């Protein structure tokens, strides 16, 4: 979990910017979006093979 301590004489905008940067670096939001809806293992394998096929094609 990302934590941000707001320092003295620091604006909320700067603290929010630091928080967003730490969340994006830790991958928290990406992990949330990946797990938002359950995917059956068969669907996950199918998507993975389609992505590999797209990478090979280009």
UniProtKB/Swiss-Prot annotation:
Keyword Cell wall biogenesis/degradation included in the entry's annotation: no
GO MF terms held by the record: structural constituent of ribosome
Entry-linked InterPro entries: Ribosomal_bS21, Ribosomal_bS21_CS, Ribosomal_bS21_sf
Entry keyword set: Ribonucleoprotein, Ribosomal protein
GO cellular component, one term: ribonucleoprotein complex
Keyword Ribosomal protein assigned: yes
One GO term of the biological process aspect: translation
Family the UniProt entry places it in: Belongs to the bacterial ribosomal protein bS21 family.
HAMAP family: Ribosomal_bS21
Protein name (Swiss-Prot/TrEMBL): Small ribosomal subunit protein bS21
Organism: Lactobacillus delbrueckii subsp. bulgaricus (strain ATCC 11842 / DSM 20081 / BCRC 10696 / JCM 1002 / NBRC 13953 / NCIMB 11778 / NCTC 12712 / WDCM 00102 / Lb 14)
Lineage: Bacteria, Bacillati, Bacillota, Bacilli, Lactobacillales
Gene name of the encoded protein: rpsU
